[in-house]
Swiss-Prot record:
It is found in: Plastid, Chloroplast. This is Small ribosomal subunit protein uS2c. Gene3D superfamilies: Glucose-6-phosphate isomerase like protein, domain 1 (3.40.50.10490), Helix hairpin bin (1.10.287.610). Disulfide bonds: none annotated. One of its GO terms (cellular component) is mitochondrial small ribosomal subunit. PROSITE patterns: RIBOSOMAL_S2_1, RIBOSOMAL_S2_2. The gene is rps2. It comes from Gossypium hirsutum. NCBIfam families: rpsB_bact. Keywords: Chloroplast, Plastid, Ribonucleoprotein, Ribosomal protein. GO terms for molecular function: structural constituent of ribosome. It comes from the Eukaryota.
Length: 236
């Protein structure tokens, strides 16, 4: 896999607060190689390491996108949800940004059944089919559709398991990460100083609580995916 230039610079990461970790009492000792200092009771992430692993992740997603691979971006906490949706839509990726339903990947047949139901209900709504039902039945199906939209709206076009999963906040999305590990799906994780860097295929040490930090990391990955997709379109 060829290395490329992704315009990752330390000043930009400093401005976004990528270097701020968790309090020194809330840390995982395995993160020691990725921490450069302690300041006012918090750990400071080594941004040189961040840049290195972010660059490796960009190389990986570019290469995968250039081969037509599918991506899933996961980030369900409030500070990540909007950034995840925007990044995924921009890069034409699937996403989960509300709640991870246990077994979403490991019990794929059940997820697939839910997606079929979701698509059927959307079609019924668009064609006016729901309005022709008795009010009670229509109300029940509309509530069901609303719930499916909330939890499955970001994966409504997913027809198979993703090739790569990008996870914002390893701690928050641990269930999703374990499912990927079980299935052998490669993962890229944004990890803070309280995480285990050995669980993902590529771990990017960074502040997973600041919106600006999350947005910056996702933006770099999105640019790489989009460039890879363009390469795939030009050379299918």
């Amino acid at each position: 896999m060829a290395r490329r230039y992704w315009n990752i610079n330390l000043e930009e990461m400093l401005e976004a607060g990528v270097h701020f970790g968790h309090g020194t009492r809330k840390w995982n000792p395995r993160m020691a190689p990725y921490i450069s200092a302690k300041r006012k009771g918090i750990h400071i992430t080594n941004l040189t390491r961040t840049a290195r692993f972010l660059s490796e992740a960009c190389d990986l997603v570019f290469d995968a996108a250039s081969k037509g691979k599918q991506f899933l971006i996961v980030g369900t906490k409030n500070k990540a949800a909007d950034s995840v949706a925007r990044a995924a839509i921009r890069a034409r990726c699937h996403y989960v940004n509300k709640k991870w339903l246990g077994g979403m990947l490991t019990n794929w047949p059940t997820t697939e059944t839910r997606l079929h139901k979701f698509r059927d209900l959307r079609t019924e709504q668009k064609t006016g089919g729901l309005n022709r039902l008795p009010k009670r039945d229509a109300a029940m199906l509309k509530r069901q559709l609303s719930r499916l939209q909330t939890y499955l709206g970001g994966i409504k076009y997913m027809t198979r398991l993703p090739d790569i999963v990008i996870i914002v906040d390893q701690q928050e999305e641990y269930t999703a990460l374990r499912e990927c590990i079980t299935l052998g799906i490669p993962t890229i994780c944004l990890i803070d100083t309280n995480s285990d860097p050995d669980l993902a295929d590529i771990s990017i040490p960074a502040n997973d609580d600041a919106i600006a930090s999350i947005r910056l990391i996702l933006n770099k990955l999105v640019v790489a995916i989009c460039e890879g997709r363009s390469s795939y379109i030009r050379n299918p």
